[in-house]
From Swiss-Prot:
It catalyses: a primary alcohol + NAD(+) = an aldehyde + NADH + H(+); a secondary alcohol + NAD(+) = a ketone + NADH + H(+); S-(hydroxymethyl)glutathione + NADP(+) = S-formylglutathione + NADPH + H(+); S-(hydroxymethyl)glutathione + NAD(+) = S-formylglutathione + NADH + H(+). Zn(2+) 2 binds at residues 98, 101, 104, 112. It is an enzyme of class 1 (oxidoreductase). Zn(2+) 1 binds at residues 46, 68, 175. It comes from Gadus morhua (Atlantic cod). Homodimer or heterodimer with H chain. This is Alcohol dehydrogenase class-3 chain L. The lineage of its organism: Eukaryota, Metazoa, Chordata, Craniata, Vertebrata. Class-III ADH is remarkably ineffective in oxidizing ethanol, but it readily catalyzes the oxidation of long-chain primary alcohols and the oxidation of S-(hydroxymethyl) glutathione. It is found in: Cytoplasm. One of its GO terms (molecular function) is S-(hydroxymethyl)glutathione dehydrogenase (NAD+) activity. SUPFAM superfamilies: GroES-like, NAD(P)-binding Rossmann-fold domains. It comes from the Eukaryota. Its cofactor is Zn(2+). Keywords: Acetylation, Cytoplasm, Metal-binding, NAD, Oxidoreductase, Zinc.
Length: 375
């Protein structure tokens, strides 16, 4: 009944940086060629949403519909779309996979660039938006915009998942869990018996711990200044817990002493450039590798002494856990359904969509791991 028509629905609109989201009735236009319109069933709230809303994101455009960790059901498809049909269970992807660009053809990366330029400007690949509110155009966000009852995404930015997958759980595989899990398995390539340090114990850090454990790490040191995070870190597989506030010396020194010279792998899951440096310098001379996952504010730069790298440490970064998205997310959903990957344990709060502000408050206060909003 809605096919080919504009849908009026609720969305949480970010009118401007630094202002709270506002629940509005918006119009969502039908999908154009190569696009898919989705009814969102559930979405997680990620620090990246708050980061963009705060105005720290150099690519943040307003007014916009934020949200990038969702799952839903295909409502209709645009011209030429063959891989999806109405009723399919799907997860929108902020890292697409066109399969044709030089990035997609290179096994070393997952960073498809096919629609990068328009996505960064908050537009669909043809340079226009599908959202409006009272006649005003709203921008898209990260190619996903899940804080709306309906959204439109490019067909290359969508993964079809198992029809029986609980969408209010697997939505988290659209960002946090895949990113952290893959950082350990794909980017760092953690080996059995290794020692790992994870800085920051939000959803991302916990997913890294899960990845390190899956890889057979013998020691996983979890680091956070909020001791409330330690219990769940232990449940996820952390073997040691370190609160930098409990020590007079720098945390990297504490770790080097604890581990007879440093860790094999470290992961920065905060987005703080001082922590990024500490994570690198906690690595073992000769072979230690540090992976940056956290997103720092616009214009910030990382630093260390070149000698740290000259003496055999490696500094890397990762996006979406190195997973080529369209092919990997359905497999991760299957792994979850086969009890190989934890998802439920990340969900500490569930709220109805209209209580989105409460979800942001819980995250800001460090009281939640993930809040899932149900529509």
């Amino acid at each position: 009944a809605t096919v080919g028509k504009t849908i009026r629905c609720r969305a949480a609109v970010a009118w401007e940086a630094g202002k709270p989201l506002s629940m509005e009735e918006v119009e969502v236009a039908p999908p154009q060629a190569g696009e898919v319109r989705i009814k969102i069933v559930a979405t997680g709230i990620c620090h990246t949403d708050a980061y963009t809303l705060s105005g720290s994101d150099p690519e943040g455009v307003f007014p916009s519909v934020l949200g990038h960790e969702g799952a839903g059901i295909v409502e209709s498809v645009g011209e030429g779309v063959t891989k999806f049909k109405s009723g399919d269970a799907v997860i929108p992807l902020y890292v697409p996979q066109c399969g044709e660009c030089k990035f997609c053809k290179n096994p070393k990366t997952n960073l498809c660039q096919k629609i990068r330029l328009t996505q960064g400007k908050g537009l669909m690949p043809n340079g226009t938006s599908r959202f409006s509110c009272n006649g005003q155009v709203l921008f898209h966000f990260m190619g996903s915009s899940t804080f709306s009852e309906y959204t439109v995404v490019a067909e290359i930015s969508l993964a079809k998942v198992h029809e029986k997958a609980p969408l209010d759980k697997v939505c988290l595989l659209g960002c946090a869990i895949s990113t952290g899990y893959g950082a350990a398995l794909n980017t760092a390539k953690v080996e059995a018996g290794s020692t790992c340090a994870v800085f920051g114990l939000g959803a991302l850090g916990l997913a890294v711990i899960m990845g390190c454990q899956a890889a057979g790490a013998s020691r996983i040191i979890a680091i956070d200044v909020n001791p409330d995070k330690f219990r769940i870190a232990k449940e996820f597989g952390a073997t040691d817990l370190v609160n930098p506030k409990d020590h007079s010396k720098p945390v990297e020194q504490v770790l080097v002493e604890m581990t007879d010279g440093g860790v094999d792998y470290s992961f920065e899951c905060v987005g703080n450039i001082a922590v990024m440096r500490a994570a690198l310098e906690a690595c073992h001379k000769g072979w230690g590798t540090s992976v940056i996952i956290g997103v720092a504010a616009a214009g910030q730069e990382i630093s260390t002494r070149p000698f740290q790298l000259v003496t055999g440490r490696t500094w890397k970064g990762t996006a979406f856990g190195g997973y080529k998205s369209v092919e990997s997310v359905p497999k991760l959903v299957e792994e979850y359904m086969n009890k190989k990957v934890k998802v439920d344990e990340f969900v500490t709060h569930t709220l109805p969509f209209e209580k989105i502000h409460e979800g942001f408050d819980l995250m800001g206060a460090g009281k939640s791991i993930r809040t899932v909003l149900n529509y």
